Amino acid sequence: MTKYVAVIDQGTTSTRCMVFNKQGEIVAQHQLEHEQICPQAGWVEHDPLEIWERTKDVIHGSVAKAGLVAADIAAIGITNQRETTMIWNRKTGQPYGNAIVWQDTRTDIVCNQMSAEGGQNRFQAKTGLPLATYFSGPKIRWMLDHYPGLRQDAEKGEALFGNMDSWLIWKLTGGPGPAAVHVTDVTNASRTMLMNLKTLDWDEELLSAFAIPRAMLPSIRPSSDPEFYGFTRQDGPFGGEIPICGDLGDQQAATVGQVCFDAGEAKNTYGTGCFMLMNTGTEMVHSNHGLLTTVCYQFGHEKPHYALEGSVAIAGALVQWLRDRMRVINTAADIENLAKLVPDNGGMYFVPAFSGLFAPYWRSEARGLIIGMTRFINRGHFARASLEAAAYQTREVVDAMQADSNVSLKVLKVDGGMTANDLLMQIQADVLGVPVVRPKVAESTALGAAYAAGLAIGYWKNSDDLCQNWGVDKSWKPSGDDTLRTKNYAMWKKAVTRTFDWLDESA
């Protein structure tokens, strides 16, 4: 009997279930968006119960499209938006509030207070991360401080913290109920600011600094676990017992999906944000140029692989904003044709610092800026500048990564929804001055989670099996001369500096 691997890909704007075959090809998929809740400036939330309902719906839709039953599915992998934080009650399964999304900046006060006590990099040696609103630790602390009765429940082990992977695994394994499993993997745990990168365990010093009870935290497991996290339920959305044995944060999953298994290999994912990861092997490399040190993956009981990461908060989210808030376009795909109407940006730059700036600046007080406007500017320039924002932010991350690793980028592997935009990919090649390559399966995030689950059960034997599945769909070579490339990049950098200190009352 032919078997398949199913993946739940829980992202920032949508949830989908995808079914893969042994060749790494998509057999079926179903996707649904969920609401972006913005109760006040700087706050971004998701409803965990809505996401669970969407998850059940996409599982049913995908399995039905593939014409499969539970017995046809060998294993399940999970991949998720990282850092997004929720806390729920162990007995009732009810969240204490909406999930606080990774883009949310309400924890700025927490981060500033802790930075004042020991500097923004006070935990970097252990966590590889700067103190920033991006990560889960400050979000948990904020919830504990603001939700009545939560701290008491957390100390008794009745309140459970999780990123979306933990929440979905808990629900899929029967939560609330005695069989429910409360776990996460090393990649997601490495984004909390609470895990020690060397021990791969929760760190008591970090927990004490954030005043977070250990009893509320999930157990940390490998990204590909031959011992399985647990099994889906007969009465659950899959309709049978299937092992859940792969779990990675979305960007680490994409790195696995792009088969970046050797030190020095890198990929860039274009989704809600932009995220570039470079595999540094089994050795940690700490950044001096604003990048993050993170766990890349851990397969079974092997040593973990680490990565340098450059995180950009806003990429595809800018296109979504143009569609939903500004009504500049009707669909996200319209941005490409609109941008094609002009040969360049007309001197206009758009720095989308909606949630501050992430790598390499880490400036939470920065805010979005459009500069260089004249009466010559039209909707086409606006669209092109929006695409260029993703390309220029990626260039900044590449520069930092090359400085930290002393490795020059020869080619950029890309994936994610925005890579369907051929114009953006050409702009990216032009901005970087190196070729850009899109694989046959551009949805590398879900594929990476499938690989992790499949390796755990022997569906694929090893990384060599996975590398054979990778192939080029399309590539773009850089055009234009270096003088113009340097000039335009300098203008972008100048625009970025104008966003600094916007929320600084003393400025």
Swiss-Prot record:
Keywords: ATP-binding, Glycerol metabolism, Kinase, Nucleotide-binding, Transferase. It is an enzyme of class 2 (transferase). SUPFAM superfamilies: Actin-like ATPase domain. Disulfide bonds: none annotated. One of its GO terms (cellular component) is cytosol. Coiled coil: none annotated. ADP binds at residues 12, 16, 272, 316, 417, 421. InterPro entries: ATPase_NBD, Carb_kinase_FGGY, Carb_kinase_FGGY_CS, FGGY_C, FGGY_N, Glycerol_kin. Inhibited by fructose 1,6-bisphosphate (FBP). It catalyses: glycerol + ATP = sn-glycerol 3-phosphate + ADP + H(+). Pathway: Polyol metabolism; glycerol degradation via glycerol kinase pathway; sn-glycerol 3-phosphate from glycerol: step 1/1. Glycerol binds at residues 82-83, 134, 250-251. GO terms for molecular function: ATP binding; glycerol kinase activity. GO terms for biological process: glycerol catabolic process; glycerol metabolic process; glycerol-3-phosphate metabolic process. PROSITE patterns: FGGY_KINASES_1, FGGY_KINASES_2. Belongs to the FGGY kinase family. HAMAP family: Glycerol_kin. Key enzyme in the regulation of glycerol uptake and metabolism. Catalyzes the phosphorylation of glycerol to yield sn-glycerol 3-phosphate. This is Glycerol kinase. It comes from Beijerinckia indica subsp. indica (strain ATCC 9039 / DSM 1715 / NCIMB 8712).
